[in-house]
């Protein structure tokens, strides 16, 4: 009998205090979709200022190649990890110092990895400063004309193979 009288009392207490009136201490959350739709105002985005890119002039060419190989493999998104690491495997060892500097600028100056991906796949035009021979090489590489399977970054064993 006590349980039967408790339930209506509990129901009245809950309906009066928590279900019908909002609690002042509860914060409501909203989800934002961050897409690149034409109506996206980007007011929900916070831009974090990054220090400007600076060319490393005190670096040997071997050190630069090693750093660029590492930076090509360790990106902020899987798509660029795969694309840039395979590109680096194919081209980095034959690049001139000028091309290495262009590639360094390309992968390190933009603050958004998606921009690099969109430029390489020609989904968006690249800014004039990045329109150069290295960007052309990257775009051609991204087309994958040989229809290679590109599902992951390459293993590093190729670095230890003797040149043919």
UniProtKB/Swiss-Prot annotation:
Domain of life: Eukaryota
Transit peptide location on this chain: 1-27
GO cellular component: mitochondrial matrix; mitochondrion
Compartments, record wording: Mitochondrion matrix
Main location: mitochondrion
BP GO terms, sorted: canonical Wnt signaling pathway; epithelial to mesenchymal transition; mitochondrial electron transport, succinate to ubiquinone; negative regulation of canonical Wnt signaling pathway; negative regulation of epithelial to mesenchymal transition; protein-FAD linkage
InterPro entries in the cross-refs: SDH (IPR005631), SDH_sf (IPR036714), SDHAF2 (IPR028882)
Record keyword Chaperone present: yes
Pfam family for this entry, one: Sdh5
Keywords tagged on the record: Chaperone, Mitochondrion, Transit peptide
The keyword Chaperone is assigned to this record: yes
Disulfide topology: none
Function text: Plays an essential role in the assembly of succinate dehydrogenase (SDH), an enzyme complex (also referred to as respiratory complex II) that is a component of both the tricarboxylic acid (TCA) cycle and the mitochondrial electron transport chain, and which couples the oxidation of succinate to fumarate with the reduction of ubiquinone (coenzyme Q) to ubiquinol. Required for flavinylation (covalent attachment of FAD) of the flavoprotein subunit SDHA of the SDH catalytic dimer.
Quaternary context: Interacts with SDHA within the SDH catalytic dimer.
Protein family per UniProt: Belongs to the SDHAF2 family.
Name of the protein this chain belongs to: Succinate dehydrogenase assembly factor 2, mitochondrial
Species of the source: Mus musculus (Mouse)
Name of encoding gene: Sdhaf2
């Amino acid at each position: 009998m006590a349980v039967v009288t408790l339930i209506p009392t509990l129901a009245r207490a809950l309906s009066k205090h928590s279900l019908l009136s909002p609690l002042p201490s509860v914060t409501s959350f909203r989800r934002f979709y961050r897409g690149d739709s034409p109506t996206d105002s980007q007011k929900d985005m916070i831009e974090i200022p990054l220090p400007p890119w600076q060319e490393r002039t005190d670096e040997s060419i071997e050190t630069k190649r090693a750093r660029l190989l590492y930076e090509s493999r360790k990106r902020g998104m899987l798509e660029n990890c795969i694309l840039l690491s395979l590109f680096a495997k194919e081209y980095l060892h034959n690049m001139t110092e000028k091309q290495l500097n262009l590639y360094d600028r390309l992968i390190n100056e933009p603050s958004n990895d998606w921009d690099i991906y969109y430029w390489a796949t020609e989904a968006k035009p690249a800014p004039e400063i990045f329109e150069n021979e290295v960007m052309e090489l990257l775009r051609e590489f991204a087309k994958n004309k040989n229809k290679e399977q590109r599902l992951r970054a390459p293993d590093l064993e190729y670095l230890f193979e003797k040149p043919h």
